[in-house]
Amino acid sequence: MKKIVVGLAVMLGFCTCVHQPSGTLDVNKALDYCAEQTQRTLAELKTDSGIDYTMMPRNIMTDEHHWNCRKATKEEWCAGFWPGVLWYDYEYTKDKQIQKEAEKFTNSLEFLSKTPAFDHDLGFLVFCSYGNGYRLTKNPAYKQVILDTADTLATLFNPIVGTILSWPREVEPRNWPHNTIMDNMINLEMLFWAAKNGGNPYLYDIAVSHADKTMKCQFRPDYTSYHVAVYDTITGNLIKGVTHQGYADSTMWARGQAWAIYGYTVVYRETKDPKYLDFAQKVTDVYLERLPEDKVPYWDFSAPGIPDAPRDASAAAVVASALLELSTYLPNGTGKRYKDAAIEMLASLNSDSYRSGKSKPSFLLHSVGHWPAHSEIDASITVSYTHLRAHETPEHL
């Protein structure tokens, strides 16, 4: 049985609003719970006529108890997370029926490899689904879908600016000539993978260029991030940094900073350039310094109503996953500090304060995707994926 020990000091540091976790984080127990919730979701998706494999669980609002599902389309950025959940669950349980379900849901996204890019979310859509599928099965058809989709994502790269255009649909309505959102850092992983697995080597250059320009322009002097960077397409210069899903242009949106932490950890992994390792630590440290005691952030670090403002479990899960990896690249002292922080985060997320339990078929409660738009609030498939990935991370470092 796989257990991670949580020190006494960690336990004592937890705030009273969170159920006190035990002295160990039992990863198998956590994954067993996720497997049970995955089965509940599958049961909920079944109808008298079977399962519609193009309909993906997306979110469960605070006053609801069942998944809201969305059709897998090029516009639906969350559609790759549920297949990814199934692949991770199969990896743990070795349940062949789960593998079959993962294959069927994954196959419903194949069209994305043959469709012009709608926006930057192709990495979320395809690498979470086909990427995990290929990792576990080595199905050559999956590999080709990833390679083709990486080429599609590359069409959004603007060499004058040096980054990928995130939201073509917002160019005219918001007068954002070339916009790049922090979420885009996650999609670089697919480009790196494709470049070293038979794809165009230029994909590597795109990923590095995007990481460099984002590092230069999308962070404040204190290493907190802007959600959106708006660039001039003629000069390539930054026009402004703004928010879209955070509280204000000047604040640190929790999930955006989480994307940055994970993204630059990946960029270091793929390049081994020490400047990215240094930067990953800087964006991590400002995040850790401002966390509440239970290590689960408020949805924005300057949100109104703190300490009663909503938390974002999805950001915590993303950061926990990143720090478990980042800790392996650093000397014992620093690495241990990051690993311990990740364990504290996972201990909180596995407590009764954050688990959905029997109330909902999701893994966790208290996520915030887009508070200003009241979207993806409370339980989301995004956090189900990132939470499961965080627990699986030690298995493939």
Language model features with spans:
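Extended ligand-binding groove/face enriched in aromatic
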Residues: 92, 96-186, 190, 194, ...
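Bacterial Sec-dependent signal peptides at the C-terminal "C-region" and cleavage site
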Residues: 12-23
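Extended ligand-binding clefts on enzyme/binding-domain cores
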Residues: 181-300, 314, 337-351
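Extended, well-ordered alpha-helical scaffold segments
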Residues: 23-37, 94-110, 139-155, 199-217, ...
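Low-complexity, Ser/Thr/Pro/Gly-enriched N-terminal "stalk/linker" regions
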Residues: 21-80, 88, 92, 96-97, ...
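Well-ordered alpha-helical scaffold segments within catalytic/enzyme domains
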Residues: 80-95, 111-112, 125-139, 188-201, ...
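Carbohydrate-binding/catalytic loop surfaces
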Residues: 50-73, 124-137, 164-183, 223-252, ...
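Conserved small/polar residues in nucleotide/adenosyl-binding loops
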Residues: 386-395
